[in-house]
Amino acid sequence: MEKYSLVVIFLLFNIISFGQIPGPSCNWYFGTNAGITFNSGSPVALTNGVLSTTEGVATISDNSGNLLFYTDGLTVYHRFHGLMTNGFGLFGDMSSTQSSIIVQKPGDPNIYYIFTSDNDVGPNGICYSTVDMSVGLGQVTSKNVQLKTPSCEKLCAVRHCNNQDVWVISHDWGNNTFTAWLVNSSGVGTSTSWSNTGAIINGVSQSAYGQLKASPDGRKLAACHYGTTTGGMNIVQIYDFNPATGFVSNGVTLHNQLGLYGVEFSPDGKVLYAGTNQGLLLQWNLCAGTLAQVQASRVQISNAGPFIGSIQRGPDGKIYVARNNTSLSVINNPNVVGLGCNYSDLSIPLANRPGRMGLPNFASFYVQPQFILPEPTIVCNTVNFSFPTSQSTGCLTQNIQYTYLWNFGDGQTSTEQNPTHEYLLAGVYNVSVTINGPCTSTTINKVVNVPPGGITVSLYTN
């Protein structure tokens, strides 16, 4: 009886694919009638947007990449770019760094929540409004339910450990408190978490400016706390986040710099970028070692001049940078430490529409990489292929362990990370691996054709 040897090599942290781009984050509207779409794989300028915002904005599409609606935190526009029913008078502000963020209600495909933040430590603080997409082009059914005031101009969202619910997170004003509201099938705020960590954010109101972002795996947060020559925090900090409890901890300062505003994690979660109002784009290697070593890893990626505004990870695995210009800048290889990240200034044209300082604010799980298996290499009768993934370990202070369960489709399994498996018969096999970690579970499938004699092997995504 012939044997067919299939050597399966699991390569952690090396390969991510963004082959399936259509999804909730593939259409962006921002600035003065500016926008881009990723539906073709690469960013293409949109010219049908109607909003005009200097900073904050949020957009949402369905899983097929069809636009649903977008907002500057004040007004909601439906997919045909008209005013959504009752979509006016929200309590965000177009001059708030992260004026809004949109999350779908768990378990209900028709209900979305728009969370808004007031600008300049305004009295409206953090509120939420409800959108029902089962009614025509959508309808705002409730508005401006206040959750917290005063607050910084910061909003981000992270998936809960149960892979269903969502944490929406902001930073209070006048203290070092993070507030995280749970969004579940019962609605908003059935559970709220408060955490005290990091710097106290107070003084001049400009300290409230700047982005708050979550790493792709939801286990790290980073925040820029803006400032000016006359005062303010002028710091970028990084924190641990527990997606099971909503608790934020271990806040540390990476850097002090005038005018820090935009911040973003690389797709693999190992590199951090931040920008300033003088036009500096900075990078840190979060896996450099100790805190001091991470701080010392800082690299100046660009000094192209003002202004580095919002920095946003895209669904294509690149990072986009708002520059208050009719073009965006892009970091083409954001997982690469140093100048090899390939920053390209003002290289994404916006059809002569001003992009201003903001980019759409997405929940971290709406811009997750898709895991797609590469084609195998064949050496004699041995087939080598990779089941790649990229789970961020957070690097700073975290040591996350993963377990693996392989099913080779012939009744045999393995819990090794890098197993070797021999098939006794030719045929077609459904191979899968499930990777489990703290608050994460990912299953990757592949259909494997094992031919007689092991001469040729073809793989295709299941």
Language-model-detected regions and their locations in the chain:
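Short, charged low-complexity linear motifs
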Residues: 12-16, 116, 221, 294, ...
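Extracellular/lumenal mature domains of secreted and surface-exposed proteins
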Residues: 366-462
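Bacterial Sec-dependent N-terminal signal peptides
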Residues: 1-25, 259-261, 380, 429, ...
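Generic anion/oxyanion-binding catalytic loop in active/binding sites
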Residues: 8, 48, 408
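Beta-propeller fold recognition
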Residues: 20-377
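Detector for intrinsically disordered, low-structure N-terminal pre-sequences
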Residues: 6-7, 114, 139, 432, ...
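A generic alpha-helix preference that emphasizes hydrophobic side chains
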Residues: 11-16, 56, 125, 175, ...
